C-alpha cells in the first residue's frame, strides 16, 4: 500500500492523465477537464474533478458549517457512486448531488485513503468523462 493521500496529490494525479487541463466549469469553479468536443475552433472540456466552493447545499452535519474544502469527483454510474459512499472511507454525497454521478470528499480527509486509492478513483473519473478512444488507448498502453 502506498502512503496516505494528500491534497497536493489531486493535481499531480489529474495532470498525469492524458489530455487534461486545469480550467473552470459552471462559471468559475476550478476544474480538471478532459476533451469533450471542439466548437468554433475552441476545445470544450468535461470536468472530472472539481474544487467546490462553500455552498449552502453542503453543510457539515456535525457543525452546521458549510464545507470549505470539498472535492467533487465524477463516477461512471450510480453503482460506482454508491460503492464509494458505502465503503469505509471519506467519500460521501449530499441531496444536491442526487441523480448526479459524483462523490464528494473533503481535502482534509484524503489521508484516510492511500495515494494509490485516490489515483484509482480519479483515473476512473477521467475514464468516465474522456472520449472512449482516448480511454481505450490509455488503458491498453498501461497493460
Residue ranges of predicted features:
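Charge-dense, helix-prone N-terminal extensions
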Residues: 1-143
